[in-house]
Amino acid sequence: MDELLRAGFAALGLPLDETALTRFETYYELLDERSKVMNLTAIHGETDVAQLHFLDSAALLTVEPLAGKSVIDVGTGAGFPGLPLKIAQPDISLTLLDSLDKRVRFLGDVCAATGLTDVTCLHTRAEEAPELRGQFDAAVSRAVARLYLLCELCLPFVRTGGVFLAMKGPDCAAELDEARSAIRKLGGTDERTARYTIPGTDVTHSVVVIRKTAPTPPKYPRRWAKMQKEHL
């Protein structure tokens, strides 16, 4: 895994020191071990995890500078993209949010085993965390949901002037068109869409960069069922 990560980070133009390498190795070992008894990821094996989880997540740092920023990862699952971002950029102040308690406990175990600090692991739903409203420089998400839904879940967490980075597949133009009304109503502007190929693979992903230009109206986010039923 070391050589894959060294080559991948070099291809992305990102630094990678020995501490980060050790942390990635520890993260992989825990992920591999726990995936045998709980549903954490469908991606297995050193090569695929290194490329499709670790490098894919770290590639966000080539899209938007996050050094010294407060970042919330919404619907983080097994910690992607948040934990690889934190390992690659340790001065990020990170909050990991997930609705499943056993995943949140796993994330806490990873932080303890890797020695990561300034990481908060929260067991809650995004629409049920009003105390976090407007508290972050950036929100990130690789969750599998339509962009308009992710925007309603994530943009309320972002301070005005901050950014929401939504990780998507190679072609998200139609999904972005579908979300533009929601982005505007939630106080955002779709600034640009960045694309990258994961080093060592032919997999191309997109990141929709949404700038928070105004406060999100207090009535958002709505309950999940209403979000799905009544498209913004």
Regions found by a protein language model. Give the residues of each.
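Class I SAM-dependent transferase core
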Residues: 1-68, 72, 102-119, 223
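S-adenosylmethionine
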Residues: 91-95, 99-232
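Residue-level marker of intrinsically disordered, low-complexity segments enriched
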Residues: 69-72, 85, 95, 207
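Conserved glycine-centered beta->alpha loop in an early N-terminal alpha/beta scaffold
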Residues: 75
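Conserved SAM-binding loop of SAM-dependent methyltransferases across substrates and taxa
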Residues: 78-91
